[in-house]
C-alpha cells in the first residue's frame, strides 16, 4: 500500500512550523515509530511526522500509528488531522478505518464517520466484526436510529449480526435510540447469550425505566449459571431502586460482598442509591461509612439520600464533611442540597447553595437545578417569586418548570395564578392530563363547577390522558402492583374486604375521607368516598398488612404524588396497627410512625 507523496508533503509543510517548539529530540533517532509512544500532544506528533518525511519514511504502519494516536483521545483538531492522514493514503485498509471509526465514536460529532464509511465501501473495502461496534456506538451516541438500522441490515448481509462483538453493540444502539423492543429481538435471536449480551439487554431495560423486564432477565441469567459482573450488578441495583425491591437488593448486596464486588466504588454507590430508594436509609449510611475511598458520586448519593428522606440537616452536614475532605461537588451534589432545602422550607439556605454552585464551583445550572429552585420557592408559598424566577430564566422554560409551580398553586389554593400558569403550560404542551386534573381540582375546591365541566370537555377534545396512580409493594421477593380504582366496581376479593374493614377502623379513630379531592359534580359523597378508598396506595398498604407478619415495616412505592387523603389515612394506619409505613412518592419519602409523618405534613 502506497501513500500519496504530495499529501504527505502537504502535511509536512503544516507540521514543520512546530519543529523549533517541540520537546522531542529527533536528531539521533532512527525509528520515528518509537517516538510516537513518547508523544504528549498533537503538536509533537506533527513534528514526528515531519521528521519521518524528511527521512523518506513512507511506511503504512507508521501512518497507522499516527492515526491511532489521534483517535485515542479525540478532539476536533486530532480527528481533523487523522482524517487528513487517512485520506492521503492511496489504499487504506479496514484496520486503519476501524481506528478512525473508534475515534469518531468518542467524538462530539460521531456521525461524521459515515461519509468516510461510504468512501471505503465505494472502494470495495468490506467492514469486519471490529468495524460495526464503533459505528453502532456512534449511532447510539447520536441517537441515529435509522443509520443504526441500516448497519444492522448490513451486518446481517455479511453474516456478522450474531458476532460476539457486534451483538452487544446492536442491543445498546437500539436501547439508546429508545427502541427497546428491537433490542430484545436482537437478543432473542442469540442462541447462547453470553454475560456481555445479557448485560447490554439488562442495562437497556434499566435505563429505559423497565425494571421488571431487567430483573426477569437477570433471573434468567442466573438460571443459566452465568456469573454476573460489575456491570450486571449496577444495572440490577438501579432496577431494584426503581421498583423499591428491597429483598432482592439485599440479596445483591450479599452477593457483592461474597464475590468481592464491594471493593468497587461504583458498586457501593449503587448500593447506597438502592437502599435509600427502597426506604432503608440506615443500610445506605452503613455502606457509605464503610467505604475506604469515597468519590464525588458516593458523597452526592448520600446527600441526595438524606434529602429525599427529609433529613435536610444531615444532608447539609454531609456536604460540609465532603468539602473538609477536599472532594469537589458536582451538579448532583447541589441537586441534593436544593431538594433538602425545598423539602424543609429552607428558602434562604437554598438560595445560598444555588449561588455557591455558580459563583464558587463554576457549575452551570441545568433545567433540573432551575426546577429545584422553583420547587423551593413555590413549596414555601412564594408563588409570585417562583413565577418571576421562571419568567426571567436565561433559557426557555420547559413545561416541567411550570408544572412544579402549578402543583404548588394547588397546595396553596391559588386559583388565579394557577390559571395563568396553566396557560403557559398549554402553550408548550397540552397533552398532559395531570395538568387539567390539578386545575380542575382547584375549580372544584372553589365551587366553580361550570369550569370543571368545561375543562373536562377541553381535556377530552385534546385527547389528554392522565397517568393512572400505581403503587407497588414487595412481599416475599415478589413485587405486587396496584392501580387506583382497582375493585371500585366489584370489590369482592379478600383484599378489598380487608380494605373496607380497615377504613371502618380508621373512621372509629377519627378518619374523615377528604371528598374534596374527588372532582365529579355528579357524584354524591358516598361515591366519592368509595373512589378515595380504592386509591393505589391504600390497596398496597392493605396488601402489606394482610401478607406480612405483625411489626413488619410496610414499604410502598407510588408513581405520583401521594394525595392528602391517603397521607392522612397512612398516619392513622401506623398508629392503629402499630406498623411503620414507608411510602416513596414521586417527590420524596414519607416515614409514617405512631400517627406522624417524617415530612411534618409539608410536601
From Swiss-Prot:
Disruption phenotype: No visible phenotype under normal growth conditions. It comes from the Eukaryota. Residues 1-38 form a transit peptide. Residues 401-476 are annotated as: Type E motif. Residues 477-507 are annotated as: Type E(+) motif. It is found in: Plastid, Chloroplast. PROSITE patterns: PPR. PPR repeats lie at residues 93-127, 128-162, 163-193, 194-228, 229-263, 264-294, 295-329, 330-365, 366-400, 432-466. Keywords: Chloroplast, mRNA processing, Plastid, Repeat, Transit peptide. Residues 508-603 are annotated as: Type DYW motif. One of its GO terms (cellular component) is chloroplast. GO terms for biological process: chloroplast RNA processing; mRNA processing; RNA modification. GO terms for molecular function: RNA binding; zinc ion binding. Involved in RNA editing event in chloroplasts. Required for the editing of a single site in ndhD transcript, which is a plastid-encoded subunits of the chloroplast NAD(P)H dehydrogenase (NDH) complex. Not essential for the activity of the NDH complex of the photosynthetic electron transport chain. Belongs to the PPR family. PCMP-H subfamily. This is Pentatricopeptide repeat-containing protein At2g02980, chloroplastic. The gene is PCMP-H26.
